Each structure stands twice: as C-alpha cells, then as structure tokens.
Amino acid sequence: MSASFLPSILTPVVTLVFPGLMFALFFVLIEQEEIA
C-alpha cells in the first residue's frame, strides 16, 4: 500500500478545511456575542 499519493490529497484538504473550521469557529463566537 503506497502512501506516495497521500500528500497530494492531504494538502488541499488541510488548506481548505482547516481555515474553514477556523472561520466557522470565529463566526460562531461572534454570533454568540451578538445574541448575548
């Protein structure tokens, strides 16, 4: 089982999902501040 293709799949996933999670978390915190 060769894992040579893994970085090419992992890189776009990390670069898209990780900032998306950070932005979603930041958005939720702002929304909670506005509601409260």
UniProtKB/Swiss-Prot annotation:
<dbReference type="InterPro" id="IPR036357">
    <property type="entry name" value="PSI_PsaI_sf"/>
</dbReference>
<keyword id="KW-0603">Photosystem I</keyword>
<keyword id="KW-0472">Membrane</keyword>
<keyword id="KW-0150">Chloroplast</keyword>
<keyword id="KW-0812">Transmembrane</keyword>
<protein>
    <recommendedName>
        <fullName>Photosystem I reaction center subunit VIII</fullName>
    </recommendedName>
</protein>
<dbReference type="GO" id="GO:0009535">
    <property type="term" value="C:chloroplast thylakoid membrane"/>
</dbReference>
<keyword id="KW-0793">Thylakoid</keyword>
<keyword id="KW-0934">Plastid</keyword>
<feature type="transmembrane region" description="Helical">
    <location>
        <begin position="9"/>
        <end position="29"/>
    </location>
</feature>
<comment type="similarity">
    <text>Belongs to the PsaI family.</text>
</comment>
<comment type="function">
    <text>May help in the organization of the PsaL subunit.</text>
</comment>
<keyword id="KW-0602">Photosynthesis</keyword>
<keyword id="KW-1133">Transmembrane helix</keyword>
<dbReference type="GO" id="GO:0015979">
    <property type="term" value="P:photosynthesis"/>
</dbReference>
<dbReference type="GO" id="GO:0009522">
    <property type="term" value="C:photosystem I"/>
</dbReference>
<dbReference type="InterPro" id="IPR001302">
    <property type="entry name" value="PSI_PsaI"/>
</dbReference>
